[in-house]
Amino acid sequence: MDYTILGLDGSLRPGTREVFEQLVARGHDVYVWSGMGGVRWDEVRRSGLEPFVKGVYRKPLADFRAGLERCGVPVVPDFVIDDYPEIVAHFGGVRIKEYLSRHQEDEEMYAVLAQIDAHQQPAPEGRGPVLTGE
């Protein structure tokens, strides 16, 4: 959550609301997790993201697969968007640069939809979408 969709100044990263809305419109479930402070629904609500978010959880910071259960995360992510490279490497997804404040030029979220679309292109033999995780 921090530095991925929220800056140090509490601002919402540019494009976050639009990208979440598009993801949900395309049939994706969106979950938010935080390694700093646990479950943070209040910030999700304040940012206007609640209509798009299916759940908010603590983020596992190590031993990621087992950490999902420890942190109460009921799903294994297919695609992770995070500034924390280790968790993206483990589950698959895209690492985006840290977002610090509204004064920062930032277009990271706008590139996320294209990366998700590329990730879900049919396999060469037509076996359906290519997904990371289970």
What feature does the model see in each segment?
Residues M1-D63:
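Alpha-helical substrate-recognition element adjacent to the catalytic core
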Residues W41-E134:
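C-terminal cap/substrate-recognition subdomain and adjoining C-terminal extension
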